[in-house]
Amino acid sequence: MYKILAGVGSIVRTLFMVFTHGFRKRDTILYPEVPAEEIVPPRYRGRIILTRDPDGEERCVACNLCAVACPVGCISLQKAEKEDGRWYPEFFRINFSRCIFCGMCEEACPTTAIQLTPDFELGEYVRQDLVYEKENLLISGPGKYPDYNFYRVTGMAINGKEKGQAQKESAPIDVRSLLP
């Protein structure tokens, strides 16, 4: 008799759990029907882009800090120099099949050239199509920081003039003279 009551109790408990879980709000999101803005959190780190400064020039100065900071080594670039002495990446390549979207490259970039967007649809049929070149990564705008220009903040050497000799430029300060 005890086994019969235990069996009936087990069946009743199972039916109770099925009905309580059956009428709950579902956790599964039907992605194509639901807009991506409802799925992706506000600070989601997705596809990597290269931005331009407010003057329209590339922000990247090919310092290679992003490639060093990348834990999986999916960034490769080659430095070149313009006539005015400014560095730029001759090629900039990101392998998205290896990228873990950690954001370390964005944090390491001193010019805010690398930024992560909330784009997450990077599926391709061929793995080689996930290797993005500079032309695929470079956008026409400044991204998250519209007013920041690296060379306005840091300055750039002028050919034929020493530091402090250019117009509206103060002479460099000897920090050791300030010590007690």
From Swiss-Prot:
Its cofactor is [4Fe-4S] cluster. It is a peripheral membrane protein. Binds 2 [4Fe-4S] clusters per subunit. Residues 50-80, 90-119 form the 4Fe-4S ferredoxin-type domain. It catalyses: a quinone + NADH + 5 H(+)(in) = a quinol + NAD(+) + 4 H(+)(out). [4Fe-4S] cluster 2 binds at residues 70, 99, 102, 105. GO terms for molecular function: 4 iron, 4 sulfur cluster binding; iron ion binding; NADH:ubiquinone reductase (non-electrogenic) activity; quinone binding. It is found in: Cell inner membrane. Its EC number is 7.1.1.-. SUPFAM superfamilies: 4Fe-4S ferredoxins. [4Fe-4S] cluster 1 binds at residues 60, 63, 66, 109. GO terms for biological process: aerobic respiration. InterPro entries: 4Fe4S_Fe-S-bd, 4Fe4S_Fe_S_CS, NADH_quinone_OxRdtase_chainI. PROSITE patterns: 4FE4S_FER_1, 4FE4S_FER_2. One of its GO terms (cellular component) is plasma membrane. It is an enzyme of class 7 (translocase). Keywords: 4Fe-4S, Cell inner membrane, Cell membrane, Iron, Iron-sulfur, Membrane, Metal-binding, NAD, Quinone, Repeat, Translocase, Ubiquinone. NDH-1 shuttles electrons from NADH, via FMN and iron-sulfur (Fe-S) centers, to quinones in the respiratory chain. The immediate electron acceptor for the enzyme in this species is believed to be ubiquinone. Couples the redox reaction to proton translocation (for every two electrons transferred, four hydrogen ions are translocated across the cytoplasmic membrane), and thus conserves the redox energy in a proton gradient. HAMAP family: NDH1_NuoI. Belongs to the complex I 23 kDa subunit family. NDH-1 is composed of 14 different subunits. Subunits NuoA, H, J, K, L, M, N constitute the membrane sector of the complex. This is NADH-quinone oxidoreductase subunit I. It comes from Acinetobacter baumannii (strain ATCC 17978 / DSM 105126 / CIP 53.77 / LMG 1025 / NCDC KC755 / 5377).
